[in-house]
Amino acid sequence: MIRRKLTKQLEIIKDYLWDMKECVLKIIDDSLIALESKDKNLAKKIINEDEKIIDDYQYDIEDLCGRIIATEHPVATELREILAIIKIISSLERIADHATKIVKVVLLLESDLDDFDFLNLYFKPLREMADTAKEMLSDIFDAYFDGDFTKILKIVKYDNIIDKLFSKQKSIVIDAMKKNPENLDYLLNILFLNSFLERVGDHVATIGELLYFIRIGEKVNLT
């Protein structure tokens, strides 16, 4: 009976975890939509509303995990899973935080985002980095819920794509700074945008490592 109750509570936590992941995916996508379209209302919604939703998910999941540890005394695999989930939701919250930083740049650089170079030279790689991070996050959660942990090992190639894009864009932006020092503030913000998405990729890889550890019980480096 106790074991059945613990299993049911873990399923509830995993349902919350899945929903939190879906919310994070939407925030990443919306942040890029706001950036491309200069949608200040969408940017403000992400900052004022969506970020709170993520915080609420984090609080609720941490609370449920704490209650299970205190009342059900899980051991071995179950305890490992609960402790890993607490770390996973922290990484999800940080991903959402980086997406929020992206939309803050929307409000800061509103007039500069009309620049032809932004859409053609700077935005396309940002979109590619964001889409790659989203695909990574979706794939590792699918692997976790499907029980196919070989898929998690394949996300290394995705993180490599993000790292290469970041490295390339960093070089392009730094070169532009040297040639156009009068645009330093604008270009610094472009560099920050790339940095935010590179960190998103790192956090997704960390989640993959934790999900792999939950089931296999072995540490793996996905970065």
From Swiss-Prot:
GO biological process, one term: negative regulation of phosphate transmembrane transport
One Gene Ontology CC term in the entry: cytoplasm
Annotated Pfam families: PhoU (PF01895)
Domain of life: Bacteria
Chief location of this protein within or outside the cell: cytoplasm
Residue pairs linked by disulfide bridges in the UniProt entry: none
SUPFAM superfamilies linked to this entry: PhoU-like (SSF109755)
Keywords: Cytoplasm, Phosphate transport, Transport
Subunit structure: Homodimer.
Family that this chain belongs to: Belongs to the PhoU family.
Function: Plays a role in the regulation of phosphate uptake.
PANTHER family: PHOSPHATE-SPECIFIC TRANSPORT SYSTEM ACCESSORY PROTEIN PHOU (PTHR42930:SF3)
Protein name: Phosphate-specific transport system accessory protein PhoU homolog
Higher taxonomy: Bacteria, Pseudomonadati, Spirochaetota, Spirochaetia, Spirochaetales
